[in-house]
A protein has these predicted regions:
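N-terminal, positively charged nucleic-acid-binding surface of large information/translation enzymes
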Residues: 1-29, 33-155
Length: 155
């Protein structure tokens, strides 16, 4: 019998995905006795400037372990992943490659998603946040305007 990690990992990753094991289940309420408690874990969003590296996993490992531990102990855990997709470095990299900044960003998000899924992270992939999504940044703009109106944002 030969150990084939890629084959075995893919098998279990497909199983977890079909069972929606890492999805958040908002209907599981602690008050109904279906979950021991609700938790939300959030890691910093990787900047979409290229491939992930070991430093990214270093930042994700402890929250990933905690998400798994809480889930295995009956807690409802929301553990989304996001991508920090705005900034001059990404725009400049896209211009240097003669492609649109949006295409550059989306390609990097796809690559990072593939990398993160391949190592079996416990993220809830049904709750991906992308800061370049208008449905996301319209709210950050709204919050900034409210802070500005109240004198909390100034030059």
């Amino acid at each position: 019998m030969k150990y084939e990690p890629v084959k075995i990992e893919r098998k279990w990753q497909r199983y977890w995905e079909t069972k929606k094991f890492y999805h958040t289940h908002p209907s599981r309420k602690a008050s109904e006795g279906k979950a021991k408690g609700n938790y939300m874990l959030l890691t910093e969003f990787p900047y979409t400037s290229g491939n992930l590296h070991m430093g990214h996993w270093y930042a994700f490992a402890l929250p990933d372990i905690l998400a798994r531990y809480l889930k295995m102990n009956g807690h409802n855990v929301m553990y989304p992943i996001g991508f920090d997709a705005f900034g001059l470095p990404a725009e400049n990299a896209a211009i240097q490659r003669n492609i649109s900044p949006n295409d550059w960003t989306e390609d990097n998000i796809k690559q990072m998603t593939k990398q993160l899924k391949s190592i079996g992270t416990a993220f809830d992939w049904s709750r991906v946040v992308k800061t370049n999504d208008p449905q996301y940044y319209k709210w950050t703009q709204w919050m900034f305007l409210k802070m500005y109106e109240k004198g909390l944002a100034y030059r």
